[in-house]
Amino acid sequence: VLELKMILAVETATAACSVAVCDGSKTFFRYSKEPRSHSEKIISMVGDVLKEAKVSFSMIERLAVTIGPGSFTGLRVGFSVIQGLAFARDLPVVPLCTLEVLAATYRRTHIEKMGDGLVISLLNARMGQCALGGFRWDGNFWSNEIAVCLLAIDTAKRLIHDREPEMVVGDVD
């Protein structure tokens, strides 16, 4: 039997900045889409979400952070915060793929409508390229059906057309 842990997670790889606390049954989160403000907002967001969840930092058993793809500066903000928190209490850190988190967020917010179809996640990588990954939920776990890759936007459009995903999520202008 898998024992669920109290987890504090941060996502700073995209234009949005988010923090969540999850105990396996309930999730509390804060989300900010204010550009270029991750470093200014994240610590107060951690405090706010812990307060809302009625959880003290001493109750956190594990930390999670997105490791990319994504904004280099944004990723460093998330890494720095999680590294500091992990060091303070010698907590384990779970690395998460940003594109898989985007797919999981879609599933969480559309669970009643979601089938078992492919979800393709995209992030703008600039210079006419995007990071792309394709994921399928089997009822228990995500499988990585299209390996995370960097593609020209036109190539990504063709791949999406050919694969006919249930949903495309992410951030490409």
Residue spans of the language-model regions?
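Short amphipathic alpha-helical face segments that pack within enzyme cores
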Residues: 41-44, 80, 101
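DPxDG-like acidic metal-binding loop motif
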Residues: 62-98
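N-terminal beta-alpha supersecondary unit
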Residues: 2-67
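Stable alpha-helical structural segments in soluble proteins, enriched in small hydrophobic residues
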Residues: 49-53, 88, 106
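Residue-level signal for well-ordered, solvent-exposed loop/turn and beta-edge residues enriched
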Residues: 25-26, 71, 140-141
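Surface "functional belts" at beta-alpha junctions
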Residues: 2-3, 37, 92-173
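Glycine-rich nucleotide phosphate-binding loop and flanking beta-alpha elements
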Residues: 16, 71, 129
